[in-house]
From Swiss-Prot:
Keyword annotations from UniProtKB, A to Z: Chaperone, Cytoplasm, Stress response
Gene3D superfamilies from the UniProt entry: 3.90.20.20, Head domain of nucleotide exchange factor GrpE
The protein's name: Protein GrpE
Residue pairs linked by disulfide bridges in the UniProt entry: none
Coiled coil (residue ranges): none
Location (main, coarse): cytoplasm
Gene transcribed to yield this protein: grpE
Amino acid sequence: MSNESIKAEQDLIHEGVESEVSTEEASLIDELTQANFRIEELEQLLADALAKVDEQKDSVIRAAAEVDNIRRRAAMDVEKANKFALEKFANELLPVLDNMERALQGTNPQDETTKAIYEGVELTQKSLLTAVAKFGVKQIDPQGQAFNPDQHQAIGMQPSAEFPTNTVMLVMQKGYELNSRLLRPAMVMVSQGGPSQESASIDIEA
C-alpha cells in the first residue's frame, strides 16, 4: 500500500473519530442545557413556594394579632360594662346610706324610747357598709382631717379656735369612693381660724 493510500485512510479514520466526538459533545451540551433549564425552573418554583410560605406566614401573624386585639377589646368592654354597672349600683345606693346617716343624727341613742330604733338603724348601716366594701365602695368621713380638694367639697369656712386652719371642722354629708375612684366628694365645713397644723402639732407634743 502506498503512502498516499495510508494517509488517506488515516484521514478518514481521524474524520470519523472527530465526527463521533462532535456528536457526543453536542449531545452532552444539549443535556447540560436542558439540565440548566430544569435547574432554573426548579429554582423559580422554589422561590415561588418560599414567597407563598412567607405570605402565608404574614397572614397567620396578622390574623393572630387581630384575634389578640379582638380579645383585648372584648375584655376591656366587659371590664367597662362591669365598672359602669357597679358604679350605677353604688350611686343608687348613696341616698339610702344618706337617709340612714340622717336617721342616726336625728335619733338620740340615750333616749330609751328611740334607743332601739337607733341601734337597729346603726346595725343596718354597718352591715350595708360592710357588704358594699366587698365591691370596693368606701365611705369618706374626713372629720378633723386636713381639707383635701380631691375628696372634699367645701360648703363654707368658719373661724374656729378648736380646729387648725384648713381643717375639716364639720362633715355635712359623707363622701364615697369606688375602688379608689371618687364617687362623691364629702360636703364639709372648713376651719379658717385657730392655730396652724404645724403649731397644733407642736402644742400637742409639748
